A protein has these predicted regions:
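Short, isolated positions in well-ordered beta-strands
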Residues: 118, 146-148
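N-terminal subdomain of lithium-sensitive/metallo-dependent phosphomonoesterases centered on the IMPase/IPPase/PAP
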Residues: 1-92
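Residue-level signal for inorganic ion chemistry
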Residues: 23, 47, 58, 95, ...
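DPxDG-like acidic metal-binding loop motif
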Residues: 80-140
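An extended, acidic
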Residues: 149-215
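Generic detector of well-ordered alpha-helical packing
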Residues: 48, 71, 91-94, 125, ...
Length: 215
């Protein structure tokens, strides 16, 4: 089935943009921050509120879709074996950055059909960067077509990610990062895997490495 003619991707993009503005305009205090399982693993009341908003608004656009979100909220079915449409949501990717107003966090929404990704939307409201991609139609940054870089490691920036709550392979990770440091022009760690991957898609980085990412 051709989903491109069935799904209103522009409407989804607008919802993701509105969710990003909720994050940008947030007034965070310590009583709105909670710990999840693992070291330095946080969730804020804004993670929950933004996910609720996304589920409610995206349901209006694609009522038949299921939802797999990072946070436990109503409407989040978290079904892994789906043959139909399913939204995958990270309401705030880069929560620690968000907590400290580091301004490198994003709203990340993917859409899958029959267990295959067909579209993705990543929005950083702090610099108004909207990354979009639809299967078969290419990837874009604010409407401009983007491509992965042609250059190799020695001619570009290498990026990586790590988290203290997923620290079982950090020794291996930092050995590889040391090699990337020696062989590249520079190494960066942004703190948002979705944004760092988009940087590779846009040609700003040549590689992104992280040992463990939760879906």
């Amino acid at each position: 089935m051709d989903m491109n003619s069935k799904v209103d991707y522009k409407a989804i993009e607008e919802v993701v943009r509105r969710a990003g503005m909720m994050m940008k305009e947030a007034h965070l205090s310590s009583d709105l921050v909670h710990h999840k399982e693992g070291a330095a693993n946080f969730v804020t009341s804004y993670d929950v509120a933004i996910q609720r908003f996304l589920i409610e608004e995206l349901h209006r656009i694609v009522p038949e879709a299921a939802f797999f979100g990072e946070e436990e909220t109503e409407g989040n079915t978290r079904e892994k074996e789906l043959d139909g449409l399913c939204f995958l949501i990270d309401p705030i990717d880069g929560t620690t950055n968000f907590m400290f107003r580091y301004n490198y966090s994003c709203v990340s929404v993917g859409l899958a059909y029959a267990k295959e990704m067909i579209a993705g939307f990543v929005y950083n409201p702090y610099v108004d960067e909207m990354f979009t991609a639809v299967r078969g139609n290419g990837a874009y940054l604010n409407g401009r077509r983007i491509h992965v870089p042609d250059s190799g490691l020695k001619d570009g920036i290498a990026s990586f990610g790590c988290a203290r709550y997923n620290n079982s392979d950090t020794d291996v990770l930092f050995r590889v990062v040391q090699e990337m440091f020696n062989r590249s022009l520079a190494v960066r760690c942004g703190g948002s895997a979705a944004l760092d991957l988009c940087r590779v898609a846009a040609g700003a980085s040549v590689v992104y490495l992280e040992m463990k990412l939760n879906p």
